[in-house]
Amino acid sequence: MKEDKLTQLQDEIGYHFQNLSLLNNALTHSSYANERHWKYERNNERLEFLGDAVLELVSSDYIFSNHKDMVEGKMTKLRASLVCEMSLASSAREIKLGEYLKLGHGEWVTGGGKRDSILSDAFEAVIGAIYLDGGLNPAREFILQYVLSDIEKKQLFYDSKTILQEIIQSKFHEKTNLSYALEKEEGPDHNKIGRAHV
């Protein structure tokens, strides 16, 4: 990716990399790397793995420190709501991450840069890249700004999902897996209202 595009993204996220190849890898989907017969180190899957762990640590620490009267089960539910695919994809859209992704031709033509799963994975990869480049503190700052800043909205979304899931399971008396896709989001950044398709 051209350096000016990488600079633009770094300005957007408020972190400038010492090692730009980390950011480049975080933006490289496996479909893009596979088309070029690149080794697995040059796509974002390993960085996503690391970023997921950093995200879990930082969000757990945040919840533990800021919700002192919350019991373990509620802390677990809150963390799950903050780091779920839809929440991370929303955070990725906030920084326009889809515009910077390197996708294989098939993913690109089918709108992969807008897909929640690809966006959330890339977002975690960026967290992993920031962690490797600058350590835990800059990764924490990034997570605080883009994931944990809107905690009430994300908790409400998870609670709505949980209620729906419990209703479905009570009607069918079995575990039913539902998937959710964000269809529309409107309103100011600090108070967005979303509509999801189940």
Task: Walk through the language-model features, giving the residues of each.
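Double-stranded RNA-binding/processing signature
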Residues: M1-H197
